């Protein structure tokens, strides 16, 4: 199972990524974050295999 962290400041974009990933039973969504600081904490805590990161957050 692959652990994933999703980091995006737009709730709609985050929920869309979650919706797509939930269709794959081999993927575990370890954390959803709305800013970079939360994202770094989640990455350190969960050690994900994949990170979905919005590269332009306000």
Question: Would you name each region that the model predicts?
Answer:
Residues 32-41:
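Helix N-cap/capping motif at the beta->alpha junctions
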Residues 8, 54:
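Active-site residues of response regulator receiver
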């Amino acid at each position: 199972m692959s652990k994933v962290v999703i980091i995006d400041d737009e709730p709609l974009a985050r929920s869309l990524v979650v919706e797509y990933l939930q269709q794959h039973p081999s993927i575990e969504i370890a954390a959803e974050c709305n800013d970079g600081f939360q994202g770094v904490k989640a990455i350190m805590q969960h050690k994900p295999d994949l990170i979905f990161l919005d590269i332009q957050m306000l």
